[in-house]
C-alpha cells in the first residue's frame, strides 16, 4: 500500500514539472526589422529576452509572452529594431518539440491510468478476501464425515506460535470469476498472527505432487500427507475433498477462522491453509505441524504401547483434559469438540498430549449449549463407542457430551482396549463402556480386571482407583451429574507424578461409598470445591497448569458394606 502511494505521488510531481517546462516554451514568433547591419549590437542590446537570428534583411525572434524584442523609440535608434511583427505560435521546429513533449505527457498519463486500475483491482481483491475471512459464527456441514484415520492425525507442534513463521514464495496476484462468484487469488500472506496462506504449488512440491508414498492417513472427507516445507520443517498437510454445495467456501473459511483463534499448548496449532482453484477444481488444504508419535490409539495398539508406563498415561490424560478445558472455558468463543476420542489426541516425542481435529466443532453459547441451534441435531456426527446417551438418543450435544467421550478415553488408557472391539468368542462387537461399567463399581475388580496387561501390574493402586472413579463419573447417564473438564483436570492433578506429594488430599474412601452419601458429599469436591478454588487463585487456562486439587472441607467417609455392587 505504501509503495503504491509513493508511486502515485512521483507521477504527480513529474506531471507538474512537465507542465512547468511546457509553460516556459517560446510561444510568440516575431519578425523584426533594423536600420543597422551590426548583428552583435542588436543581439546584445535588443534581443536579450528572445532568441533572434538574422534571416536575409530581417530578424526572426522566438520570444516568451513576458519578453519581446526592444524597439527603438520613434524608430530612430539604430542599435535596436525599428519594428517587429509578433504573432502567437511557434516555428516548425518548436512545434515538433511541443508534439514530442505532448507525447511524453500522454504516455505518462496512460501509465498513471494503468497503475490506478491495478491499484483498484488489488483493492477489490483485498475487500473480497477480507469479507471471505471475516469473523463469522463457525458452522459445520451436516454431511461431513466424523473423523479420519488415526495415522492422518500425525501433527506436531514443537515451537510456540511466535516461532511458527515460514518463508513463502510469492505468486502472481489476480482475481478470477468462476461459478458466478469472484474468487480471489493473491500473494500469500499471514492472517491472525502466524497463520499463513500457502500456494497450492508450494504444498504440491512439499508432498512430492501428493504422492501416494506421502500419504499418512485417509478419511471420508480428507486425505493427509506428510510434507517437507521450504524451511525444512515437516508438516501434516490435510487435503480436503471437494464437496458439492454453495456453502463450501463459507464452511472452510469459518474452520480456518476457528482454528486460527486457538493458542494453547495442549491444542494442535494450525500453521496455514490454502484455498485456490487448480484447473477446474477448488483446492482446500490445512497445514498442521507434525506429531512424531501419532495418536494415542496408535501408541496403545503399537510398539510404543510397551513404553507407555502408568505415569505416562496419567500425564497424557491430564494434558488432553487441559486441552478440552481450554476449549470449553477459555477459548474465544468457547468450543464444543463433538468428536473427542483417542485418535484425536496426539502425542509428541515427549508424550505431551494435544487435542486435534476440530472439523465438527461448534461454538458454545453462554448456557454451554451449541450456538446457532435450538433443536436437536438431525444427524449424528462423531464416532461410535464415544457417543453420550443424550446425544445418541435425542441428538442434544453439550459440554457434558465431550466429558462422556473423555471418560471413554480414560477407559482406553486404563485398559488399553478399543472403544468397540470383537470379544474373544468373535460373536458381534462389544462396547468398552458396557464391558467396563460393572467392573467400575467394585474396587477389587478395578485392580484385578481393568488394568492393561502391558502395564504388568506396575501402577499405584490408589492412583488406579482414582482414575477409574473419574472415568465412572464421566460416564454417568445424567449429564448434570458428570464433572466439568475443570473438575477433571483438578482430580487428575492429584495423581500426576508432578504432584505426588498432594495425593493424600483426595479421599480414597469416597470413591466406592453408597450413592446417597456420594450425592451429599459431591458438592464438597465437585461444585463447591471448584468454586472455592476459583476464589482462592486465578488460573491461566492458556498454558499448562500443575495446580493441586485440595479438599479441606471434605472429611473422609468410611467404606460401608453397601458400597460394593
Curated annotation (Swiss-Prot):
Extracellular side: 24-103
Family annotation (InterPro entries): Kinase-like_dom_sf (IPR011009), Prot_kinase_dom (IPR000719), Protein_kinase_ATP_BS (IPR017441), Ser/Thr_kinase_AS (IPR008271)
Post-translation changes: Phosphorylated.
Record PTM Phosphothreonine, positions in chain: 378, 383
UniProt signal peptide: 1-23
Name of this protein: Receptor-like serine/threonine-protein kinase NCRK
Keyword annotations of the record: ATP-binding, Cell membrane, Endosome, Glycoprotein, Kinase, Membrane, Nucleotide-binding, Phosphoprotein, Receptor, Serine/threonine-protein kinase, Signal, Transferase, Transmembrane, Transmembrane helix
Active site: 339 (proton acceptor)
Record's bilayer topology term: Single-pass type I membrane protein
GO molecular function: ATP binding; GTPase binding; protein serine kinase activity; protein serine/threonine kinase activity
Expression across tissues: Mostly expressed in leaf primordia, root and shoot apical meristems, lateral root primordia, and stele of older roots and hypocotyls. In leaves and cotyledons, highest levels observed in trichomes, vasculatures, and hydathode endothem.
Domain Protein kinase: 210-495
GO cellular component: endomembrane system; endosome; endosome membrane; plasma membrane
Leading EC class: transferase
Glycosylation sites: 27, 37, 45, 77, 85
Localization of this protein: Cell membrane; Prevacuolar compartment membrane; Endosome
Binding positions for ATP per the UniProt entry: 216-224, 238
EC number: 2.7.11.1
Source species: Arabidopsis thaliana (Mouse-ear cress)
Cytoplasmic side: 125-565
Segments passing through the bilayer: 104-124
Amino acid at each position: 500500500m505504501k509503495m503504491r502511494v509513493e508511486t502515485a505521488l512521483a507521477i504527480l510531481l513529474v506531471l507538474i514539472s512537465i507542465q512547468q517546462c511546457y509553460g516556459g516554451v517560446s510561444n510568440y514568433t516575431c519578425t523584426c526589422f533594423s536600420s543597422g547591419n551590426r548583428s552583435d549590437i542588436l543581439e546584445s542590446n535588443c534581443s536579450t529576452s528572445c532568441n533572434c537570428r538574422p534571416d536575409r534583411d530581417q530578424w526572426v525572434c522566438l520570444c516568451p509572452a513576458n519578453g519581446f524584442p526592444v524597439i527603438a523609440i520613434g524608430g530612430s535608434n539604430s542599435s535596436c529594431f525599428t519594428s517587429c511583427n509578433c504573432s502567437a505560435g511557434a516555428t516548425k521546429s518548436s512545434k515538433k518539440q511541443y508534439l514530442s513533449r505532448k507525447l511524453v505527457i500522454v504516455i505518462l498519463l496512460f501509465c498513471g491510468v494503468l497503475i490506478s486500475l491495478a491499484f483498484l483491482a488489488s483493492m477489490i481483491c483485498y475487500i473480497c478476501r477480507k469479507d471471505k475471512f471475516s469473523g463469522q459464527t463457525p458452522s459445520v456441514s451436516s454431511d461431513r464425515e466424523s473423523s479420519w484415520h488415526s495415522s492422518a492425525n500425525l501433527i506436531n507442534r514443537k515451537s510456540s506460535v511466535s516461532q511458527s513463521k515460514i518463508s513463502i514464495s510469492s505468486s502472481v496476484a489476480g482475481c478470477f470469476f468462476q461459478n458466478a462468484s469472484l474468487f480471489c487469488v493473491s500473494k500469500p500472506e499471514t492472517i491472525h498472527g502466524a497463520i499463513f496462506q500457502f500456494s497450492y504449488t508450494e504444498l504440491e512440491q512439499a508432498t512430492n505432487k501428493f504422492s501416494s508414498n506421502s500419504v499418512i492417513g485417509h478419511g471420508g472427507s480428507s486425505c493427509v500427507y506428510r510434507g517437507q516445507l521450504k524451511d525444512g520443517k515437516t508438516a501434516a498437510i490435510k487435503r480436503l475433498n471437494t464437496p458439492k454445495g454453495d456453502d463450501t467456501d463459507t464452511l472452510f473459511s469459518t474452520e480456518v477462522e476457528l482454528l486460527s483463534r486457538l493458542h494453547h499448548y495442549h491444542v494442535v496449532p494450525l500453521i496455514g491453509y490454502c484455498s485456490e482453484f487448480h484447473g477446474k477444481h477448488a483446492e482446500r488444504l490445512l497445514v498442521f505441524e507434525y506429531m512424531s508419535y501419532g495418536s494415542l490409539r496408535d501408541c496403545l495398539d503399537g510398539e510404543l504401547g510397551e513404553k507407555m508406563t502408568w505415569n505416562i498415561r496419567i500425564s497424557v490424560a491430564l494434558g488432553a483434559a487441559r486441552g478440552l478445558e481450554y476449549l470449553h472455558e477459555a477459548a474465544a468463543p468457547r468450543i464444543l469438540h463433538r468428536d473427542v476420542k483417542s485418535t484425536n489426541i496426539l502425542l509428541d516425542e515427549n508424550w505431551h498430549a494435544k487435542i486435534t481435529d476440530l472439523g465438527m466443532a461448534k461454538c458454545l453459547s453462554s448456557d454451554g449449549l451449541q450456538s446457532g441451534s435450538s433443536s436437536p441435531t438431525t444427524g449424528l456426527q462423531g464416532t461410535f463407542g464415544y457417543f453420550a446417551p443424550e446425544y445418541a438418543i435425542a441428538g442434544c450435544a453439550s459440554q457434558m457430551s465431550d466429558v462422556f467421550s473423555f471418560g471413554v478415553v480414560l477407559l482406553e488408557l486404563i485398559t488399553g482396549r478399543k472403544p468397540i472391539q470383537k470379544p474373544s468368542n468373535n460373536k458381534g462387537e462389544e462396547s468398552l463402556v458396557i464391558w467396563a461399567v460393572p467392573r467400575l463399581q467394585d474396587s477389587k475388580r478395578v485392580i484385578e480386571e481393568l488394568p492393561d496387561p502391558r502395564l504388568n501390574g506396575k501402577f499405584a493402586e490408589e492412583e488406579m482407583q482414582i482414575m477409574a472413579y473419574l472415568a465412572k463419573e464421566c460416564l454417568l447417564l445424567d449429564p448434570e451429574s458428570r464433572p466439568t473438564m475443570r473438575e477433571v483436570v483438578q482430580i487428575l492433578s492429584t495423581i500426576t507424578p508432578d504432584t505426588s506429594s498432594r495425593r493424600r488430599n483426595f479421599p480414597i474412601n469416597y470413591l466406592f461409598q453408597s450413592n446417597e452419601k456420594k450425592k451429599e458429599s459431591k458438592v464438597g469436591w465437585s461444585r463447591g470445591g471448584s468454586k472455592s478454588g476459583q476464589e482462592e487463585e486465578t488460573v491461566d487456562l492458556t498454558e499448562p497448569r500443575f495446580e493441586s486439587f485440595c479438599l479441606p472441607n471434605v472429611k473422609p467417609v468410611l467404606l460401608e458394606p453397601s458400597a460394593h455392587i
